[in-house]
Amino acid sequence: MSAQKPGLHPRNRHHSRYDLATLCQVNPELRQFLTLTPAGEQSVDFANPLAVKALNKALLAHFYAVANWDIPDGFLCPPVPGRADHIHHLADLLAEASGTIPANASILDIGVGANCIYPLIGVHEYGWRFTGSETSSQALSSAQAIISANPGLNRAIRLRRQKESGAIFNGIIHKNEQYDATLCNPPFHDSAAAARAGSERKRRNLGLNKDDALNFGGQQQELWCEGGEVTFIKKMIEESKGFAKQMMWFTSLVSRGENLPPLYRALTDVGAVKVVKKEMAQGQKQSRFIAWTFMNDEQRRRFVNRQR
């Protein structure tokens, strides 16, 4: 019997241990990065960023029909099971208005990244349509290359450059647009120094030297912003009030539970009608996202049925 990964959403495709033989058939370059654990089990060299990228290529091709995926060196290489979990929990949140998961939901991904991971999973699993925003032109080019290299994605995913410094929704959500939800994996650290220190800790934990790259990687805009995660999400909350009738649910990952109280206070200040916290777990890692809406139950039901 395959061992189960604790805590993953019931619809997550990654409950069992990776079938490395199958994944190596899907992406033969993964084979060179296989290693043995102290218990003698075959695994992937997760300390090697090229190994993690090869694993992601195989997972996305095998489970999500993304035959062509790549990212430039130095950009964030996200864990696929964890990102899939976020998508499935978001689907549950969207289902509460009508009792079923909407098949043609429109989702806004704030900071789509060079990897385009959330749209790739959401399109395959639920047939959703995505708009991805990004401040980095290099990340945007990478995401567009992924979309263009996989037939059908151009019809489901569109990208927009955020040109307004410090803005999140302003300049991205157009006047007459409506979205079922937004999702975001905000920058965690509050300075470049803090981001470097975090990378150093991970290097030490993995037994790497300073010259070794990290699969956690990430560019400046992916890892840190002035004031860190709390300040970024507070800015989201502040701007969200101006789009209260165009967005059913605003959501964001929150990396640390202790960051929740100031965010709850900010949500009270802007008059959020309902606030939800979704807890998630991937192995030993605990995470959560918060969601808020300015619509009551009846307004959300009408919103979901607007063009169905």
Swiss-Prot record:
Main EC class the enzyme belongs to: transferase
Organism expressing this protein natively: Shigella dysenteriae serotype 1 (strain Sd197)
Molecular functions (GO terms): 23S rRNA (adenine(1618)-N(6))-methyltransferase activity
Keyword Transferase: yes
UniProt-listed Pfam families: Methyltransf_10
Protein name, UniProt field: Ribosomal RNA large subunit methyltransferase F
Top-rank lineage group of the source organism: Bacteria
EC number: 2.1.1.181
